[in-house]
Amino acid sequence: MIDPHIFRAYDIRGKAGSQLTEDACRQIGAAFGEVLIEKYGKEHPHPTVAVGRDARTHSLDFETALIDGLSSAGCKVLRIGQTPSPVNYFTICNAKLDAGVQITASHNPKEDNGIKLQLRNAEAYSGEDLQDLRRRIETFPSPLGERG
């Protein structure tokens, strides 16, 4: 079960490894991918998402898991690597992508990590949308994304 407390007003954030895990990132990616398919699927059957990360030691693993989730939902991913959040926003707008995800906890302690989600034109996916995403994840069969 995903920790509901990581879903904040403007982003998803928590202690890396306990509150925010690779499995949680995979579930978040899959759920956000479903949202994008529902929102943009008639225009683009496979919405394209820019995914970047900060320099935290766990960000690469979280990025990989989140990309697994997005891909499992049917999204295409443009992996932009280690970048600050504004580069992700620029990429979404400049390349006219459907969405973006940045793995970052910004100014928070190094033990934390987080996820910022954006739609087209780098519009923040936040507020009640994040709570809807959480509820969607809570309906997923458990565990999602385990590999055999």
Model-derived regions, located:
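Gly/Ser-rich phosphate-binding catalytic loop and adjacent alpha/beta segment
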Residues: 2, 9, 14-148
